[in-house]
Amino acid sequence: MYAVIKTGGKQYKVAEGESIFVEKLDVQAGEEVVFDQVILVANGDDVKVGTPLVEGAKVVASVDKQGKEKKVVTFKYKPKKHSHSKYGHRQPYTKVTVKSIEA
């Protein structure tokens, strides 16, 4: 059984027991989070596609950890002018493990 959920402006295909990295959620590690924006639920040959969401479907997951990705470095410069700038960015994420899919 798998489902497609929408969170953080992105869509993720999830299955029970699977761990995924999603955009940062405002919850602590160890807490449960419920994703109720379910776009598709499939159980074998039984596939339910929402218009746009599947009514009554939800995915329950537990938060494993909060973290930041590797740093992305951007360097800009103007040739022949002593002008340059270096920027770094680390995108925050939340690692969740799917406990159950209810449809």
UniProtKB/Swiss-Prot annotation:
Q: Which GO terms describe its biological process?
A: translation
Q: What would be one Gene Ontology cellular-component term for the protein?
A: cytoplasm
Q: Which GO terms describe its molecular function?
A: rRNA binding; structural constituent of ribosome
Pfam families attached to this UniProt entry: Ribosomal_L21p
Q: What InterPro entries is this protein classified in?
A: bL21-like (IPR028909), bL21-like_sf (IPR036164), Ribosomal_bL21 (IPR001787), Ribosomal_bL21_CS (IPR018258)
- Origin, by domain of life? Bacteria
UniProt entry keywords in alphabetical sequence: Ribonucleoprotein, Ribosomal protein, RNA-binding, rRNA-binding
Listed PANTHER family: 50S RIBOSOMAL PROTEIN L21, LARGE RIBOSOMAL SUBUNIT PROTEIN BL21M
Q: Give the family per the record.
A: Belongs to the bacterial ribosomal protein bL21 family.
Query: What does the function comment of this entry state?
Result: This protein binds to 23S rRNA in the presence of protein L20.
Subunit structure comment from the entry: Part of the 50S ribosomal subunit. Contacts protein L20.
Task: Please name the NCBIfam families in this protein's record.
Answer: L21
- Protein name, per record: Large ribosomal subunit protein bL21
Q: Give the gene name.
A: rplU
